[in-house]
Design a protein with these regions (language model features):
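N-terminal Rossmann-like FAD-binding beta1-loop-alpha1 element of flavoenzymes
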Residues: 1-28
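Conserved FAD-binding subdomain of flavin-dependent enzymes
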Residues: 38-41, 46-80
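Mobile amphipathic helical/loop "lid" adjacent to a hydrophobic cofactor/ligand pocket
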Residues: 65-134
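Mid-domain catalytic core of redox enzymes
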Residues: 168-288, 300, 304-305
């Protein structure tokens, strides 16, 4: 069967890979010039380094993401040290259980549903009981393109997956309750026996107009609102003396501030500079500031928490604003996330915003892909 996957983020990549592993012919359509969606590396010639668009951390229960890494051959590039450190202003540190779970991204508590972290905790505890290991947070030891994309490209070449860049899908075509193909924004029609739509919630409007019940799916757009994350890749002239690979700054200005030591995480040679990355979640205010102001804010913060950062000089600063990083689920919107199965035969949804056991995470993206692929494989096996 010819399957079309719309969107080349983790959910689309995993869908394309697993459909091709099941023997189907797959075309992957991505509107940008590169794959990876919200998980990408950004090579920086000026410092001859490859930082990411933002630090991504893993939780020990990420079974579907691990399945994806098995498919692309990079499972060994994720490390679970079993600890994170909480750092106090002035430099004191604590290693705590809080550090393990607080590594996951957060939104402002006054505007987001308490059900989301509660569900996350339940999922984490269930996975920990199932695998008989304590919940822990891990990190990639390579950049995100090496982790997610390079191996996927090889697997696509082996499995005959066609990847089309700058292919913007305008709509899914439905005939007599069955999917018939997709239409690109330049009018080209691509016929398909099955389609997985793996675009983010903020891009889904208009794509499913021919799907019965699409109004209900589009309701999610109002309730799952984008949360900005600002990351700053700081190349400094000296070590700031982090004791752990990742540290959560206790009592920071925003919802959650974290600092990452790429020397420890990537076994990076620091002879030319020391690379630290900072992450500010729910950075609604910070994202409005200039790059110079953001860098200054982050350096001030490092100086408050790390005595060794007092005299540090910035060799290069790289600010990454991601205004649509994750989504916040507003109170009262439980049940708003749609199932992967749609009312149209041969059409499934994927993406971190569709209904999974997780909130907006890489694991949610991959779990949604696994479920969407199951829907399509069921359909492929039905007699027609
Ligand atoms: C800075 C940052 C930090 C994060 N930290 C973590 C973390 O620590 N742990 C964690 O688990 N998660 C984290 N996340 C969240 C995680 O990255 C996302 O949940 C996940 O990558 C979403 O994958 P996706 O495939 O659902 O969507 P996306 O990655 O957004 O992929 C969707 C793709 O669809 C394409 N597309 C959209 N519209 C169209 C169209 N009409 N036609 C064709 N293509 C289209 C887009 O260009 C994109 O490539 C973080 C995200 C960010 C940005």
């Amino acid at each position: 069967m010819h399957c079309v996957v719309i969107g080349g983020g983790l959910s689309g990549l995993a869908s394309a890979l697993w459909l091709s592993e099941a023997g189907h012919r797959v075309t992957l359509l991505e509107r940008r010039g590169s794959l990876g969606g919200r998980t990408t590396a950004i090579p920086l010639d000026i410092v001859d380094d490859v930082p990411d668009n933002g630090q991504h951390v893993f939780a020990s229960g990420y079974v579907h993401l691990m399945r994806y890494l098995d498919s692309v051959g990079t499972r060994e590039s994720v490390c679970f040290p079993g600890h994170m450190t909480v750092r106090m202003p002035g430099g004191g540190t604590r290693r705590s259980a809080f550090g393990r779970v607080a590594g996951l991204r957060a939104d402002k508590p006054d505007i987001s549903s308490a059900k989301v972290p509660a569900d996350l905790l339940v999922t984490g505890i269930r996975e920990a009981r199932r695998t008989k290991t304590p919940i822990s947070i891990g990190y990639p030891t390579v950049d995100l393109d090496t982790l997610f994309i390079d191996g996927a490209k090889k697997a696509f070449a082996n499995n005959g997956v066609e990847v089309r860049h700058r292919a913007v899908v305008a709509g899914v075509e439905v005939v007599d309750g069955t999917v018939a193909g997709v239409i690109l924004n330049d009018g080209e029609r691509i016929p398909a026996g099955a389609v997985i739509c793996a675009v983010p919630v903020w891009n889904v409007k208009g794509l499913l107009d021919q799907v019965p019940g699409h109004e209900r799916i589009y309701e999610a757009i109002e309730h799952l609102t984008p949360v900005p994350i600002v990351s700053v890749n700081l190349y400094l002239d000296r070590s700031i003396g982090m004791t752990d690979w990742g540290e959560i700054l206790y009592g920071g200005e925003g919802v959650l501030e974290q600092v990452w030591d790429r020397q420890q995480m990537h076994s990076r040679n620091a002879s030319r500079n020391h690379f630290y990355s900072t992450t500010v979640s729910a950075a609604y205010e910070l994202t409005q500031k200039s790059n110079a102001e953001i860098t200054e804010t982050q350096m001030d913060m490092l100086r408050r928490y790390y005595p060794d950062a007092a005299g540090a000089e910035v060799i290069h600063s790289h600010v990454v604003r991601m205004p649509k990083s994750t989504f916040a689920q507003r109170p009262g919107s439980s049940g708003i996330r749609p199932d992967q199965r749609t009312a149209v035969a041969g059409l499934a949804l994927a993406g971190d915003w569709t209904r999974t056991d997780w909130t907006t995470t890489m694991e949610g993206a991959c779990q949604s892909a696994a479920r969407a692929v199951d829907v399509i494989l069921d359909y492929a096996n039905q007699p027609r």
